[in-house]
């Protein structure tokens, strides 16, 4: 072994200065090591040297194994230490005393607050981490075991429902009526009285709970023990009866009613779009519109189109994007208003008009649409099993032209039994405009068919070949042929024979009872027949024959449907006026081969009423 290696083996660097004694001692140790090494080599011989090398390798391998085990043990101990720390934290957390909660009543300048907790009103201190200026009356706060406020929460979201009777003069208290008509005074939480809430609070409030002027009759969420009202709750019964939407229906979707559409646009859109002209001429806008006529002729469709068109026109006037036009169409489910409990129907009507006034106060047009108006507001005194109309009708009248005006609100009613509606509702000043939706004639029927038979529909190749592949010409010919067949005065189209009081007789055809709904049904039948034809023959496309067959099927299905007690009703339905009808006989020949049937004693109303 070289001297430098020996020096490194004994851990003495060459550049380290040594004293004379240390140098002598080191030199002596080197000589002894050399002697011992020579003795060892002479004792073991050549074979011993090889065995010694193997032992060294084994020892090195064992050292590596022990080092790896030691590393794993170190990692295990580290993980165990971390688990012990986590368990210690969990034990400390579980050992903490319980926290209490209370409702903040008021805050003071000396950093103390009044809190209602455990049925007591207490004055408590706040943790330095709490910013007292951000605390709001009625807010939930958390207390530690020393009854110190340590955390600010949100406003209470559960509790009892009470009805607001009135807001007191100070604006911070209210008289509410709870269960069993129990009256009490409660504080109003700041979301109910604040004009501007601080950052962080509006996020917890939806559109129905944002600050607005409270009105008598509002439902409030109340904590009777703390004496606070936290939130205004939307009335579920009104939500069930009212559908707020902007219908996706335009005037272009309606066929055959050009004159009626112009009338209702003049009655509804002009007053909203040109208010200054109405004021200049001292002209009062109409308060309501009645759409009446036979069923299936588009009364409800027109009402939806009015709401859509009015919203877009108002957006254009204001310079807003018409795609984001906003309007409210309150579609009232008429018969669901009726309730067996006395006064409930009237209350629902009040709530509906209250909702309409709230929406209209924003300057947005509101349309209140009563479908099947005759089911709710029938003539007073005509009730058989009840007299509910004697109070429901006056409630509607008081809402339309009572002390409270209806600004930006218009009422639209639809009915196919206008004779059953109370006359007081129909007088001028209430439902001013009355528009009759008549049955379509041949020209109107072509317009309606054009809404359903468009150029985008697949047409059979044979039919296209007749018009040299011109799809528009083929579609136009289809419409003309199907209208000619539907409105032809031929024997196959005869429906009823009516006898008048003077003895005269008249034949009524299916065209006298046609409607937009029937036309849509004919087209739907034809499309279904075209689909079946594709499945059977593999040849796609709609054919003229499909439409003609659908007309025959539609007429044949009506053979057993017409029935009425009063023959005069048929004259009203068909639009006939004049001589009284005393006898009716059906002339339908289709599915049944039996003789024609007289109608003068049957009791049920058919689909045409």
Swiss-Prot record:
Residues 1-24 are annotated as: Disordered. GO terms for biological process: modification-dependent protein catabolic process; proteasomal protein catabolic process. The keyword ATP-binding applies. One of its GO terms (molecular function) is ATP binding. Residues 608-609 are annotated as: Docks into pockets in the proteasome alpha-ring. The keyword Nucleotide-binding applies. Pathway: Protein degradation; proteasomal Pup-dependent pathway. This is Proteasome-associated ATPase. Homohexamer. Assembles into a hexameric ring structure that caps the 20S proteasome core. Strongly interacts with the prokaryotic ubiquitin-like protein Pup through a hydrophobic interface; the interacting region of ARC lies in its N-terminal coiled-coil domain. There is one Pup binding site per ARC hexamer ring. Upon ATP-binding, the C-terminus of ARC interacts with the alpha-rings of the proteasome core, possibly by binding to the intersubunit pockets. ATPase which is responsible for recognizing, binding, unfolding and translocation of pupylated proteins into the bacterial 20S proteasome core particle. May be essential for opening the gate of the 20S proteasome via an interaction with its C-terminus, thereby allowing substrate entry and access to the site of proteolysis. Thus, the C-termini of the proteasomal ATPase may function like a 'key in a lock' to induce gate opening and therefore regulate proteolysis. Belongs to the AAA ATPase family. Pfam families: AAA (PF00004), Prot_ATP_ID_OB_C (PF16450), Prot_ATP_ID_OB_N (PF17758). ATP binds at residues 296-301. HAMAP family: ARC_ATPase. InterPro entries: AAA+_ATPase (IPR003593), AAA_ATPase_domain (IPR050168), ATPase_AAA_core (IPR003959), ATPase_AAA_CS (IPR003960), NA-bd_OB-fold (IPR012340), P-loop_NTPase (IPR027417), Prot_ATP_ID_OB_2nd (IPR032501), Prot_ATP_ID_OB_N (IPR041626). Consists of three main regions, an N-terminal coiled-coil domain that binds to protein Pup and functions as a docking station, an interdomain involved in ARC hexamerization, and a C-terminal ATPase domain of the AAA type. It comes from the Bacteria. Keywords: ATP-binding, Chaperone, Coiled coil, Nucleotide-binding, Proteasome. One of its GO terms (cellular component) is proteasome complex. SMART domains: AAA. Residues 19-96 form a coiled coil. PROSITE patterns: AAA.
